[in-house]
Amino acid sequence: MHAFCVGQYLEPDQEGVTIPDLGSLSSPLIDTERNLGLLLGLHASYLAMSTPLSPVEIECAKWLQSSIFSGGLQTSQIHYSYNEEKDEDHCSSPGGTPASKSRLCSHRRALGDHSQAFLQAIADNNIQDHNVKDFLCQIERYCRQCHLTTPIMFPPEHPVEEVGRLLLCCLLKHEDLGHVALSLVHAGALGIEQVKHRTLPKSVVDVCRVVYQAKCSLIKTHQEQGRSYKEVCAPVIERLRFLFNELRPAVCNDLSIMSKFKLLSSLPHWRRIAQKIIREPRKKRVPKKPESTDDEEKIGNEESDLEEACILPHSPINVDKRPIAIKSPKDKWQPLLSTVTGVHKYKWLKQNVQGLYPQSPLLSTIAEFALKEEPVDVEKRKCLLKQLERAEVRLEGIDTILKLYLVSKNFLLPSVPYAMFCGWQRLIPEGIDIGEPLTDCLKDVDLIPPFNRMLLEVTFGKLYAWAVQNIRNVLVDASAKFKELGIQPVPLQTITNENPSGPSLGTIPQAHFLLVMLSMLTLQHSANNLDLLLNSGTLALAQTALRLIGPSCDSVEEDMNASAQGASATVLEETRKETAPVQLPVSGPELAAMMKIGTRVMRGVDWKWGDQDRPPPGLGRVIGELGEDGWIRVQWDTGSTNSYRMGKEGNYDLKLAELPAPAQPSAEDSDTEDDSEAEQTERNIHPTAMMFTSTINLLQTLCLSAGVHAEIMQSEATKTLCGLLQMLVYREQHRSWCTLGFVQSIALTLQVCGTLSSLQWITLLMKVVEGHAPFTATSLQRQILAVHLLQAVLPSWDKTERARDMKCLMEKLFDFLGSLLTMCSSDVPLLRESTLRRRRVCPQASLTATHSSTLAEEVVALLHTLHSLTQWNGLINKYINSQLRSITHSFAGRPSKGAQLEDYFPDSENPEVGGLMAVLAVVGGIDGRLCLGGQVVHDDFGEVTMTRITLKGKITVQFSDMRTCHVCPLNQLKPLPAVAFNVNNLPFTEPMLSVWAQLVNLAGSKLEKHKIKKSTKQAFAGQVDLDLLRCQQLKLYILKAGRALFSHQDKLRQILSQPAVQETGTVHTDDGAVVSPDLGDMSPEGPQPPMILLQQLLASATQPSPVKAIFDKQELEERMSRCCFWRRRTTKLEQILLFIRRMNSVCEKENTNATASN
């Protein structure tokens, strides 16, 4: 080109052509497309919500909710009319078929057997049919034998007899007993003698009895009202025809299949992958198919991925319904009958053939509906048709959203599906709240035919399965991208809109689409939808999302410290000392300095201005600052103003009229405590934080829904969910949402309780209950919640299946309770802190239950619950009796001469002490004071729960019906008595009566006769005698355990009538003198009968008490419990201090020796 240029050639710029990013462009057409997607999503959502409840449905709600209408209408067509004048009903179908014939044909098509035609012939009194005549003869013969005949005999055409036949047909149809009636007339075909059919099946007998009662009721109505039989029976016949001709049976195969067939059930995700891997090598070994077939199979597999995750023909009844091999076509019923009566796994078939399970409530409900003076008008039919119409509109809505996505996936912008699904969930950018989306696809359509229900559930299941698949795709792409770029999740608290801290899951391009998918799944799901979601890997996807989001805090310890700040496990005596009120200055510069503008004042000590402040009470308000000359200006309530001396010449004319406003109380002393979660909703609105909240809400929703529907869910789905909860609690990742209290809230059914009480769960919960140092208020809360969870799930255990586990767990609980009562290791940190704070060895007394006693009371309540259950009662009784017999062995092994009370108890270092104390504590209780987590009574609020104790001794209580907490002083609360031990569940055999008699004997022993033994183990002055302490503690628990006998008066009378065990023969005093025993059995008249236990208790009770008679029983019991727990804690601390002193003395000796050698 240079050769053809004229002049100087200018080189062009080397800049490339800039191609704009299509994703960042916007135009009116693009906005229109998004808005149309939003509107179409809203339209589909309104269709899915369908029509609201009509006034007619609300009016007829009583009968629509009864068991009669549970099958719905016989027809599944919407275009159904009812001629009210001619009392005819029909479906708008082509052709002119009469109503009766169309009904009969539809019944035959619906049921697919001959029972409906047989029942229809009975209702029409077609005695020309041999089967009908034979059946009616058998019924009449049986009614005569059992005296179920009416006093008046009516001809077959009489209205009363017509009512009887129609009611008989209705009961047989709605109880699904038509096949039973047919079996009675096919005795020849079955090869069974006619004699055996004289005794009808129990289900048919119950039907005959209801029919007889209905006939008697009609006769009575005719006699009382004086109307003709035709007038009395006409409305009854109308209602019975409605039940027979228009309603589907309440108990039928269709409904049974619906309940047994897991429509949306699917295998767990990992099992499907494993089966797919196993099938691949097998496909390689089989002969290769033609290419066209392979291509079709490939396309079919790709298209059926969603269907495979949604629908799987997995039903527990498939195994039962295998075709039975028939030996001979002539004798086809005999092998069937032998199979039914011989094999237990064909229980469902035996029920269908023999009708073994009649439903008495349904029989009475049908009879009540037929005889009730209420016409079956067209409104009830309209109610049932309204539900059919609502179901079709809802199906149209879900079909619309699925078709819209398929169109938008291939032809529309990527942002259009987001707008469309926002409309589906009614999330509009601006405007008023238009309500919540549909939560249950079967809402208000319970009475539609089974096929329509299945169609609705399957279609909605496709939408949920599609949402799970999209979430999986987004998370897999995000995980691969983060791994490629080396992005590590950061703590969620460091991510804000001002400081994004780099890329995160909430900032990826698909984040908004992921949020809307999570929101779509956060609903109250039914059992079938839960099976689909849990087995499709939804829980794993949620865990992946949380991993990509990052931890919610820097460390678990910070969370622990934050939650434990300002909390205590008990109320110490020192925290209840109230500070003296500050005396306000009467005069002086301090008083003048407190007078600010607006302060209310009155005349003071130096007042000399007459009645300027009148009329009484003479109050005013400061309106000017105090001047340097010592004058201040005041406006009185009368309106006059003047200046007064406040420091001038040393005079003070005014004083304060009211106390100054006190300082604002701290957060822990406020009167109310609301949830802090509501305050954090607007604190962090970063997309990643929103993603975290949405994921947590999805997990909580799935857990709560599973707790409600676990009885009809797949066991694999329930195990998957409970396995995730167990893993979170084990790794201590549950503090944000999966707390032990939340896990307890879903333990509602036997299925969930059985899964939550597996060996892994029990081991984990016992580890939490036993706890570990440091023992804080937060750790005590976790221990209490773990005990409550055990109390919720352990009643589901079956003794035949888990007898060994029950015995091991019961022994572990008693051992742990014994260690708590003997060691009190969890109270040592509290004692040490109090000691170091006060610089003295004597600790402060606890006004509420301590850490150890609170936990011990919870374990005792758990054992009380288990002891009331049949499967646990025998094990616990056996353990209690074995421990109580140790007292008997002590009596038998020690001489009565010169024996003291503590001689009958095991040594303090004996392991038997813990077991004995645990058993006595279970029978008699431990500590009746206020405790954390316990139920208390407030004067104004009633029964509340203690949830927190502040460091200043204030107690936070929570209502059971709301989340608002209140802070109350200790003196406003009273403990609610716990559930007492039920002595009636103990076996009082003759050997155990003697054991209890010896316990009562120890409880009533005379304390002044026992000499306190000086321990030789005391290392320094002031150390507690462990033997004496243990003796006093056991004596206290024996006294409490004896009170449990008050509710068993007959056994208590037998125990108190037994002879008392004499304590001593002679008692030696310190100076060597001998004191004769006070046996009371020697008199001038001769020997008297031996003393019984009742006399011994009376003698002990009338002794002079060393305690003043100003304390009631409750105060004495609290002082004794406090003394025992305080002494045990003191003993533990003394051992620690003794060890420290010994170590210090050893170190001092070594230092002295080293100095001397140098």
UniProtKB/Swiss-Prot annotation:
Pfam families: MIB_HERC2 (PF06701). GO terms for molecular function: metal ion binding; ubiquitin protein ligase activity. One of its GO terms (cellular component) is cytoplasm. Residues 281-302, 662-684 are annotated as: Disordered. Gene3D superfamilies: SH3 Domains. Residues 587-660 form the MIB/HERC2 domain. Residues 293-302, 668-679 have a biased composition (Acidic residues). It comes from the Eukaryota. GO terms for biological process: protein ubiquitination. This is Putative HERC2-like protein 3.
